[in-house]
Protein backbone atom coordinates (compact mmCIF):
# COMPACT_ATOMS: atom_id res chain seq x y z
CA UNK A 1 0.00 0.00 0.00
CA UNK A 2 1.20 3.53 -0.79
CA UNK A 3 2.60 4.92 2.47
CA UNK A 4 1.42 8.42 1.58
CA UNK A 5 -2.15 7.22 1.26
CA UNK A 6 -2.09 6.33 4.93
CA UNK A 7 -1.43 9.92 5.93
CA UNK A 8 -5.03 10.98 5.60
CA UNK A 9 -8.07 11.23 7.81
CA UNK A 10 -7.79 11.06 11.54
CA UNK A 11 -4.17 9.82 11.63
CA UNK A 12 -3.00 12.96 9.85
CA UNK A 13 -5.16 15.25 11.96
CA UNK A 14 -3.65 13.79 15.12
CA UNK A 15 -0.14 14.25 13.77
CA UNK A 16 -0.70 17.85 12.69
CA UNK A 17 -2.40 19.61 15.61
CA UNK A 18 -0.85 23.01 14.91
CA UNK A 19 -1.66 23.52 11.27
CA UNK A 20 -4.15 21.02 9.81
CA UNK A 21 -6.06 23.67 7.90
CA UNK A 22 -8.36 22.53 5.10
CA UNK A 23 -6.99 23.39 1.68
CA UNK A 24 -3.72 24.84 2.97
CA UNK A 25 -1.42 22.18 1.57
CA UNK A 26 -2.99 22.02 -1.88
CA UNK A 27 -2.82 25.80 -2.18
CA UNK A 28 0.81 25.78 -1.10
CA UNK A 29 1.67 22.90 -3.42
CA UNK A 30 0.12 24.61 -6.44
CA UNK A 31 2.20 27.71 -5.75
CA UNK A 32 5.36 25.64 -5.37
CA UNK A 33 4.67 23.81 -8.62
CA UNK A 34 4.14 27.13 -10.40
CA UNK A 35 7.43 28.42 -8.98
CA UNK A 36 9.23 25.30 -10.21
CA UNK A 37 7.74 25.71 -13.69
CA UNK A 38 8.78 29.37 -13.76
CA UNK A 39 12.34 28.26 -13.01
CA UNK A 40 12.41 25.91 -15.97
CA UNK A 41 11.50 22.58 -14.40
CA UNK A 42 9.56 20.51 -16.97
CA UNK A 43 5.94 19.81 -16.10
CA UNK A 44 6.58 16.07 -16.39
CA UNK A 45 9.13 16.23 -13.55
CA UNK A 46 6.89 18.44 -11.43
CA UNK A 47 4.00 16.01 -11.81
CA UNK A 48 6.18 12.95 -11.25
CA UNK A 49 7.67 14.25 -8.01
CA UNK A 50 4.85 16.27 -6.44
CA UNK A 51 1.64 15.30 -8.20
CA UNK A 52 0.35 13.05 -5.41
CA UNK A 53 2.01 14.50 -2.33
CA UNK A 54 0.34 14.99 1.02
CA UNK A 55 2.07 16.19 4.21
CA UNK A 56 4.37 13.52 5.58
CA UNK A 57 3.37 12.96 9.21
CA UNK A 58 6.62 11.16 10.02
CA UNK A 59 8.64 14.18 8.88
CA UNK A 60 6.49 16.55 10.91
CA UNK A 61 6.69 14.41 14.02
CA UNK A 62 10.49 14.27 13.85
CA UNK A 63 10.78 17.97 13.08
CA UNK A 64 8.47 19.06 15.90
CA UNK A 65 9.74 16.74 18.58
CA UNK A 66 13.48 17.12 18.45
CA UNK A 67 15.09 16.61 21.89
CA UNK A 68 15.27 19.82 23.88
CA UNK A 69 17.82 18.66 26.45
CA UNK A 70 21.44 19.76 26.27
CA UNK A 71 24.14 17.10 26.37
CA UNK A 72 27.56 17.75 27.77
CA UNK A 73 30.54 17.19 25.51
CA UNK A 74 31.51 14.22 27.68
CA UNK A 75 28.15 12.53 27.08
CA UNK A 76 27.96 13.49 23.39
CA UNK A 77 31.48 12.29 22.64
CA UNK A 78 30.92 8.98 24.46
CA UNK A 79 27.99 8.29 22.12
CA UNK A 80 29.51 9.55 18.88
CA UNK A 81 33.08 8.37 19.37
CA UNK A 82 32.12 4.81 20.24
CA UNK A 83 34.43 1.87 19.70
CA UNK A 84 32.37 0.35 16.90
CA UNK A 85 32.55 3.57 14.87
CA UNK A 86 36.28 3.88 15.50
CA UNK A 87 36.97 0.29 14.47
CA UNK A 88 34.86 0.61 11.32
CA UNK A 89 36.68 3.82 10.50
CA UNK A 90 40.03 2.10 10.81
CA UNK A 91 38.87 -0.56 8.36
CA UNK A 92 37.56 2.09 5.96
CA UNK A 93 40.82 4.03 6.22
CA UNK A 94 42.81 0.95 5.24
CA UNK A 95 40.50 -0.11 2.44
CA UNK A 96 40.29 3.43 1.02
CA UNK A 97 43.94 4.43 1.45
CA UNK A 98 44.73 4.88 -2.24
CA UNK A 99 41.47 6.72 -2.86
CA UNK A 100 42.01 9.04 0.09
CA UNK A 101 45.57 9.77 -1.05
CA UNK A 102 44.31 10.72 -4.51
CA UNK A 103 41.59 12.94 -3.06
CA UNK A 104 44.05 14.66 -0.72
CA UNK A 105 46.39 15.29 -3.63
CA UNK A 106 43.61 16.92 -5.64
CA UNK A 107 41.83 18.95 -2.95
CA UNK A 108 44.40 19.43 -0.18
CA UNK A 109 42.05 17.94 2.41
CA UNK A 110 43.53 15.11 4.47
CA UNK A 111 42.00 11.73 5.21
CA UNK A 112 41.26 12.56 8.85
CA UNK A 113 38.47 15.12 8.41
CA UNK A 114 36.94 13.15 5.55
CA UNK A 115 36.77 9.96 7.60
CA UNK A 116 35.49 11.96 10.57
CA UNK A 117 32.64 13.54 8.61
CA UNK A 118 31.84 10.27 6.83
CA UNK A 119 31.67 8.37 10.10
CA UNK A 120 29.58 10.88 12.01
CA UNK A 121 27.18 11.86 9.23
CA UNK A 122 26.17 8.39 8.03
CA UNK A 123 28.35 5.83 9.83
CA UNK A 124 30.45 5.49 6.67
CA UNK A 125 27.45 5.47 4.35
CA UNK A 126 25.36 2.85 6.16
CA UNK A 127 22.70 5.17 7.68
CA UNK A 128 21.72 7.67 5.01
CA UNK A 129 18.05 7.99 5.95
CA UNK A 130 15.05 6.49 4.19
CA UNK A 131 12.87 9.49 3.37
CA UNK A 132 11.86 10.57 -0.11
CA UNK A 133 13.73 13.87 -0.19
CA UNK A 134 11.21 15.81 -2.27
CA UNK A 135 8.38 14.52 -0.10
CA UNK A 136 10.20 15.56 3.08
CA UNK A 137 11.32 18.95 1.79
CA UNK A 138 7.87 19.82 0.47
CA UNK A 139 6.34 18.97 3.84
CA UNK A 140 8.87 21.14 5.67
CA UNK A 141 8.43 24.01 3.21
CA UNK A 142 4.67 23.97 3.80
CA UNK A 143 4.84 23.60 7.57
CA UNK A 144 7.40 26.36 8.09
CA UNK A 145 6.25 28.59 5.23
CA UNK A 146 9.89 28.41 4.27
CA UNK A 147 11.39 29.86 1.12
CA UNK A 148 14.57 27.92 1.91
CA UNK A 149 12.92 24.50 1.80
CA UNK A 150 10.90 25.44 -1.28
CA UNK A 151 14.18 26.28 -2.99
CA UNK A 152 15.58 22.92 -1.94
CA UNK A 153 12.59 21.15 -3.51
CA UNK A 154 13.32 22.86 -6.82
CA UNK A 155 17.03 22.03 -6.50
CA UNK A 156 16.10 18.38 -6.01
CA UNK A 157 13.95 18.52 -9.13
CA UNK A 158 16.88 20.03 -11.01
CA UNK A 159 19.08 17.07 -10.04
CA UNK A 160 16.57 14.88 -11.87
CA UNK A 161 16.34 17.24 -14.85
CA UNK A 162 20.14 17.29 -15.15
CA UNK A 163 20.22 13.51 -15.31
CA UNK A 164 22.40 13.26 -12.21
CA UNK A 165 20.03 10.87 -10.42
CA UNK A 166 16.49 9.55 -10.94
CA UNK A 167 13.74 10.57 -8.54
CA UNK A 168 13.73 7.23 -6.75
CA UNK A 169 17.39 7.68 -5.83
CA UNK A 170 16.79 10.95 -3.97
CA UNK A 171 16.61 9.39 -0.51
CA UNK A 172 17.88 10.96 2.69
CA UNK A 173 17.05 12.31 6.12
CA UNK A 174 13.72 13.77 7.20
CA UNK A 175 15.33 17.22 6.79
CA UNK A 176 16.21 16.52 3.16
CA UNK A 177 19.94 15.83 3.52
CA UNK A 178 21.05 13.25 0.98
CA UNK A 179 23.50 10.44 0.61
CA UNK A 180 26.72 9.60 2.39
CA UNK A 181 27.79 13.25 2.90
CA UNK A 182 24.22 14.33 3.81
CA UNK A 183 24.19 17.16 1.27
CA UNK A 184 21.13 19.32 0.79
CA UNK A 185 20.05 19.37 -2.88
CA UNK A 186 21.46 22.86 -3.51
CA UNK A 187 24.81 21.77 -2.05
CA UNK A 188 24.77 18.72 -4.30
CA UNK A 189 24.31 20.95 -7.34
CA UNK A 190 27.11 23.33 -6.34
CA UNK A 191 29.59 20.93 -4.78
CA UNK A 192 29.09 17.23 -5.53
CA UNK A 193 31.53 15.82 -8.05
CA UNK A 194 32.12 12.52 -9.75
CA UNK A 195 35.66 11.44 -8.95
CA UNK A 196 35.49 8.93 -11.78
CA UNK A 197 34.68 11.75 -14.18
CA UNK A 198 31.33 10.57 -15.54
CA UNK A 199 29.66 13.90 -14.65
CA UNK A 200 26.94 12.21 -12.58
CA UNK A 201 28.00 12.47 -8.93
CA UNK A 202 26.73 9.45 -7.02
CA UNK A 203 26.80 10.37 -3.33
CA UNK A 204 24.51 7.46 -2.42
CA UNK A 205 26.46 4.37 -3.50
CA UNK A 206 29.92 5.60 -4.56
CA UNK A 207 32.47 6.03 -1.77
CA UNK A 208 34.79 7.80 -4.21
CA UNK A 209 32.21 10.39 -5.25
CA UNK A 210 31.05 10.86 -1.66
CA UNK A 211 34.53 11.43 -0.20
CA UNK A 212 35.63 13.62 -3.10
CA UNK A 213 32.47 15.70 -2.76
CA UNK A 214 33.12 16.19 0.97
CA UNK A 215 36.69 17.24 0.17
CA UNK A 216 35.47 19.65 -2.49
CA UNK A 217 33.04 21.17 0.02
CA UNK A 218 35.76 21.72 2.62
CA UNK A 219 38.20 23.06 0.03
CA UNK A 220 35.65 25.57 -1.25
CA UNK A 221 34.92 26.60 2.35
CA UNK A 222 38.57 27.56 2.84
CA UNK A 223 40.37 24.46 4.11
CA UNK A 224 44.02 25.04 5.07
CA UNK A 225 46.03 22.12 3.72
CA UNK A 226 48.27 20.35 6.20
CA UNK A 227 46.70 21.93 9.27
CA UNK A 228 44.55 20.23 11.91
CA UNK A 229 41.16 21.49 12.97
CA UNK A 230 41.70 20.87 16.66
CA UNK A 231 43.81 18.95 19.14
CA UNK A 232 43.32 17.85 22.72
CA UNK A 233 45.55 19.62 25.25
CA UNK A 234 46.12 19.78 28.99
CA UNK A 235 45.49 23.01 30.88
CA UNK A 236 46.64 24.08 34.33
CA UNK A 237 44.06 24.45 37.08
CA UNK A 238 45.19 28.05 37.48
CA UNK A 239 44.32 29.02 33.88
CA UNK A 240 42.17 32.13 33.52
CA UNK A 241 39.27 30.73 31.50
CA UNK A 242 37.87 34.17 30.70
CA UNK A 243 40.08 34.26 27.60
CA UNK A 244 38.85 30.91 26.28
CA UNK A 245 36.19 30.30 23.65
CA UNK A 246 35.93 29.96 19.90
CA UNK A 247 36.03 33.70 19.23
CA UNK A 248 39.09 34.42 21.37
CA UNK A 249 41.87 33.66 18.91
CA UNK A 250 45.41 34.03 20.20
CA UNK A 251 48.42 31.98 19.06
CA UNK A 252 49.79 28.59 19.98
CA UNK A 253 52.73 30.35 21.61
CA UNK A 254 50.40 32.46 23.75
CA UNK A 255 48.58 29.41 25.09
CA UNK A 256 51.78 27.50 25.74
CA UNK A 257 52.94 30.54 27.68
CA UNK A 258 49.79 30.26 29.79
CA UNK A 259 50.71 26.71 30.74
CA UNK A 260 48.73 24.83 28.09
CA UNK A 261 50.47 21.56 27.24
CA UNK A 262 50.27 19.98 23.82
CA UNK A 263 50.29 16.19 23.89
CA UNK A 264 53.04 13.88 22.60
CA UNK A 265 52.66 13.23 18.88
CA UNK A 266 51.03 16.59 18.14
CA UNK A 267 51.86 18.12 14.77
CA UNK A 268 54.80 20.50 14.65
CA UNK A 269 53.00 23.80 14.17
CA UNK A 270 54.44 27.32 14.20
CA UNK A 271 54.12 29.11 17.53
CA UNK A 272 52.51 32.12 15.83
CA UNK A 273 49.71 30.02 14.31
CA UNK A 274 46.31 31.41 15.38
CA UNK A 275 44.53 29.24 17.93
CA UNK A 276 41.70 29.47 20.41
CA UNK A 277 41.27 27.40 23.55
CA UNK A 278 37.93 25.63 23.83
CA UNK A 279 36.62 24.08 27.05
CA UNK A 280 33.32 22.53 25.91
CA UNK A 281 32.34 21.43 29.43
CA UNK A 282 33.97 24.32 31.24
CA UNK A 283 36.76 24.22 33.79
CA UNK A 284 37.81 20.72 34.74
CA UNK A 285 36.64 19.11 31.50
CA UNK A 286 38.50 18.30 28.31
CA UNK A 287 40.37 21.12 26.60
CA UNK A 288 41.17 21.68 22.93
CA UNK A 289 43.19 24.09 20.87
CA UNK A 290 41.15 24.90 17.78
CA UNK A 291 42.42 26.32 14.51
CA UNK A 292 41.14 27.88 11.29
CA UNK A 293 40.00 24.50 9.96
CA UNK A 294 37.70 24.14 12.95
CA UNK A 295 35.65 26.98 11.48
CA UNK A 296 35.65 25.24 8.10
CA UNK A 297 34.16 22.09 9.65
CA UNK A 298 31.57 24.25 11.41
CA UNK A 299 30.61 25.48 7.95
CA UNK A 300 29.61 21.88 7.24
CA UNK A 301 27.67 21.66 10.51
CA UNK A 302 27.58 24.72 12.82
CA UNK A 303 28.19 22.86 16.08
CA UNK A 304 31.29 22.96 18.27
CA UNK A 305 30.60 19.41 19.43
CA UNK A 306 30.33 18.22 15.83
CA UNK A 307 33.56 19.90 14.77
CA UNK A 308 35.42 18.52 17.79
CA UNK A 309 34.06 15.03 17.13
CA UNK A 310 35.05 15.14 13.45
CA UNK A 311 38.60 16.05 14.40
CA UNK A 312 38.78 13.46 17.17
CA UNK A 313 37.33 10.63 15.09
CA UNK A 314 39.69 11.40 12.23
CA UNK A 315 42.69 11.22 14.56
CA UNK A 316 41.48 8.00 16.17
CA UNK A 317 40.88 6.07 12.97
CA UNK A 318 44.28 7.06 11.58
CA UNK A 319 46.17 6.25 14.76
CA UNK A 320 46.49 2.52 14.09
Region spans (language model):
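Flexible, glycine-rich surface segments
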Residues: 174-175, 179, 184-267
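Tryptophan-centric aromatic hotspots in well-structured domains and transmembrane helices
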Residues: 24-28, 115-119, 172-174, 229, ...
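Non-transmembrane alpha-helical segments in soluble domains
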Residues: 33, 157, 215-219, 311
Amino acid sequence: MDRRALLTGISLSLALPRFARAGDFNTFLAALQARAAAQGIPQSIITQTTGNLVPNADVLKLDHHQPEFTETWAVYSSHVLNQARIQEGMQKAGASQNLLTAITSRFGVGAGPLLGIWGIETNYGTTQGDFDVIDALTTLAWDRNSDYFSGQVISAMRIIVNGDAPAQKLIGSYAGAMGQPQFMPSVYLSTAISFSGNNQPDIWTSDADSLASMANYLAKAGWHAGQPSSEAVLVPASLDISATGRENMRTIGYWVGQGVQRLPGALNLPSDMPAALLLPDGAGGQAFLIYANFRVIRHYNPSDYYALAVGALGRMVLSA
